[in-house]
């Protein structure tokens, strides 16, 4: 029998997801009688390969195999497979074998599939078709019989390995639906950058991959628990409370508190008990629910619907982009709908603590007995409701976030409505109608409220709302207000966890949490119950009340110039900004307003129409319109509506087909580059032959930016270009929907892709497709699951869908609907590709020979021409500056840059920015040396911005581990081959690029440290942070070697072009430059870093030291001095 492929990553992934993973022969050996051989002499090679490559995976909830299987074949293979498919469809089970099959729906379903009575096929399933027509599977049925093969197909999951590294699923629940076992997260991960322990920095004394002890210290502070070592084996002493920290013998990946529910079996319990000696038994929870003495399970503590998960108390995305509604609380808000009485207080208590949803006013309610703990809370919460009814929210808003005297008067939408929380009208001066110039916009943009003003408003509202008895002490009140301040300082993707909210809150100060009066010894279970009740109250206060205040009084948004930092505009200010922005947008883009009859017609249209909503993002000189695509006209719930899902699926199919044509005929895109990889390939292909020909001639650079590229594309011309791409009357496509599952950093990662082909290159069998993708280098260490396969996707149908999307695009602005008559929506996944196709067609027609001896690149709408011919450079510039109306191309002269003189009057009086002949030429975040053609990174975009606002990492239960992961993931993105390629760049340039990458990484490191929860000081676990710095250097050097594969960079004794010691020195020097500015924070790190740098300095040869010191010249990093962190 042939040897089974290793496929180690795939086998590890399957072992983490199933109870048992066995080779097919081993599984059958357990069931077969003595002397029964599965593989015999003379068997076909296909059958031997099937047995060697097939893995049997037993799910955790699988039924046991037949007790005494007969090993007798009764049915043919097609009949058995059909019978299994019918049973799966009748059970409604999700099984890869039954994908594409469903039960007949009356007489309209057509004839049933052969050997079935009520199953029809609505999509091809190539895996099932291959199985039931395979001679090898037929021989397997003959050897094992009906009982065993039926059990394998219906109760187990079968995978076929495809060498060298992949596999595909044959049957069983799809792998992407399974949740990996808790052991998968605890599986140790390989250290980055090889097995090096760092560069002489002290390592934590831990067995968890080098940084477990520090992580444990970070965890211990988060939990308020002390960690003790009871023996050399690291066992934990008995604890009263469930521990939530890192357990001895576990990797940093172990997230016990979030391990999924699992089916407990004796086999699994024994295996886990054997592998985790010394662990605290059972999963630990933060706030174990359940009220002792309450007889009904309906009163259990559980997260209420619509709230964030247990790990997130408040997320900034919940109060972003909330326009309209006036500066008042919604009438439907819970506090506004309840009277300040004991009955209202009871409803409030039930909603906050017992997951009860208040019904509509006046609706009869069935009274339920309230537990004693919650019954005695009613007077306090009645007082809270009374405080809310008496709170002058309008006066508080005016006092803490005042409007300037010149602010415009609010329109009718902002008049105070009857009810609690309204904001009375103020008396700002009215703005003249029709004033929409940029000066007015800039004036309004400066009138945002600072986070400190917003915090003052929230603090005043909370102090008026919450009675002192609910806080219990001033300490608890100050802790909560500190978290409110932190919520306002988070970025666009920030979140505040439940653990941060309850940290350092004193439960014993809150007398209202007690189930009965009296001071006596509090059992551990009772204390945990009080923690849970207090946590629910704080969760509601922050996640409902504070968030509602922000949603009601402010429009919160990010900007284009401050990354993810949030800005707070009062609703009255933003309404004026939005009106000016809409007026400018209507002047710039051709929109036709729809009548009410046309709106109803579009809502009932088939196929469904995409509807976009327009919002604006502030930029330095005005507002940038952003179109959010994804809604369907008339759909009640966009994410779940079937019309939305169907249309979204069709759009993704069109996107996959356009990408297929782009890859098959790259000339259609002209000079388009779709990312850094494309830029690297094109620039390398231009630079290396040019240098090989001898001394490079003077080169002329032209950078041109197009104004409003997406909004200016003529729809008729775009339709002509896409018709040439799709050739709808000729092409028919085959689209295969596949899921790819792999492991990355110890976690299961899944992606869903569409593989497009035509009949000329179609791979009929999934095995062939997996082999093809591996040969192309686009698939590795993954399991492929085929979801569906469409063999007849007409090009005409896809072209009609494209016309439908472009010419029937509805935009909602305010309460009105418009049809876009020119351009395409920017928020669609198709936008970039459509723009690239259109401009590619323009380049092929207008500039067919411009790339001779030069290169033309275009990233969407940013052109770059490099040519040794001055005449061609001037002709190219002149053509684009005059504009190309046929393609809607109009140049923004303020962003046009050249490095040669432009004759006066040659461009009609306009003059672009002229740089010296030899300079660092800027283009799309790059700095190109106009003489040597070397590439540097352009970091000017970081000027006067906060790294902390732009870098967000999910802190969770393991903030240190997540910080390290985030930093290394960002480092991998920034270490691109374009900057590290030693064939394109000189060694000195690579030294400089590496140093700047490490210096920016040091800024990110500091930003992450500032974001660590629970006020974690660096001095508490310096070994962990030193290891993060060591990992940064080793990962950076590993990426450098990967970007220069085949080159010899270093040797023993710090010899070679770029030894690892040089990368370590650059990393240490960059971190010391940044961390030394914060001596108090990093006092425990600076000494070790300086010692390690000095040791490396002695090891490096003199020429290398001189080159490194030149790369670290402070003059080269002047841009970093303006970063705000």
Swiss-Prot record:
Residues 186-308 are annotated as: Disordered. The modification Phosphoserine is found at residues 231, 450. Residues 598-928 form the Reverse transcriptase domain. A motif (Bipartite nuclear localization signal) lies at residues 226-244. The record marks 860 as: Required for nucleotide incorporation and primer extension rate. Residues 364-514 are annotated as: QFP motif. Residues 1-234 are annotated as: RNA-interacting domain 1. Residues 313-543 are annotated as: RNA-interacting domain 2. Belongs to the reverse transcriptase family. Telomerase subfamily. This is Telomerase reverse transcriptase. It comes from Bos taurus.
